[in-house]
A protein has these predicted regions:
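Conserved beta-strand scaffold positions in the cores of enzyme catalytic domains, especially
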Residues: 3-9, 54, 83, 111-116
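Inter-motif core of Ras-like GTPase G domains
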Residues: 28, 40-62
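Conserved beta-strand segments of the P-loop GTPase G domain that flank and frequently precede/overlap
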Residues: 9, 33-37, 54-60, 82-89
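NTP-binding/hydrolysis catalytic cores, primarily Walker-type P-loop NTPases
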Residues: 128-173
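Flexible, charged surface loops at secondary-structure boundaries
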Residues: 22-31, 46-50, 76-80, 108-110
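P-loop/Walker-type NTP enzyme "switch/lid" segment
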Residues: 1-32, 41, 123-130
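Beta-strand-loop-alpha "switch" segments that mediate conformational coupling across diverse proteins
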Residues: 90-142, 146
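Conserved C-terminal guanine-recognition region of P-loop GTPase G domains, centered on the G4
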Residues: 67-78
Length: 173
């Protein structure tokens, strides 16, 4: 993807700096860094406690839920987190079930949640985008695009800029 870097398999910021040939003391120049932590040992390595924003992203398959809760249970300090759900149903009962299995985690859940529908048409477009290393909206459901815009606006706090960028993506610019 143009102007987007992916760093997969790193265990801390210094590993990423070494890979990029940066001195350990150098600061990253990225506007945003999204870090997927699926291992509780990485909570401290990537210092989630001082992150500006934290998200818990999951589907409702039992394995994904339990593995995610396993990581959350290892938090040593309270952390504010927003839920991002990928689900077909998007019901309150799913959220209630998740809250039940996450009882005891040191999390202050953000009131807002973002739901992404899991529709076959969206999955097909996502796979095609990955294969082509491009970001295209054509073929994505309106619900998916809306969720993507909401999440992006939450991350960067600039709704006008996000709307403009989404219009450009829609036009293929």
């Amino acid at each position: 993807y143009a102007n987007i870097d992916f760093a997969i398999g790193f265990t801390n910021y210094n590993d990423i700096k070494t890979y990029l040939g940066m001195p350990q003391s150098a600061a990253f120049t990225y506007d945003y860094m999204l870090i997927d932590i699926d291992n509780s040992d990485l909570l401290n390595n990537f210092d989630v406690y001082s992150s500006k924003k934290n998200y818990f992203v999951t589907s409702f398959d039992l394995y994904a839920l339990k593995r995610g809760v396993e990581v959350l249970k290892r938090l040593s300090l309270p952390v504010e987190i927003m839920k991002v759900y990928f689900s077909n149903l998007m019901s309150q009962s799913e959220d209630d079930y998740f809250n039940y299995i996450a009882t005891g985690c040191r999390v202050k859940w953000n009131q807002d949640k973002i739901y992404f529908p899991l529709l076959n048409e969206d999955l097909d477009v996502i796979k095609e985008n990955q294969r082509l290393s491009k970001i295209r909206f054509k073929g994505l459901s309106n619900e998916y695009k809306t969720s993507l815009m909401e999440w992006t606006q939450d991350i960067c706090g600039d709704s006008n800029g996000v709307k403009k960028a989404c219009r450009q993506i829609e036009r293929g610019v």
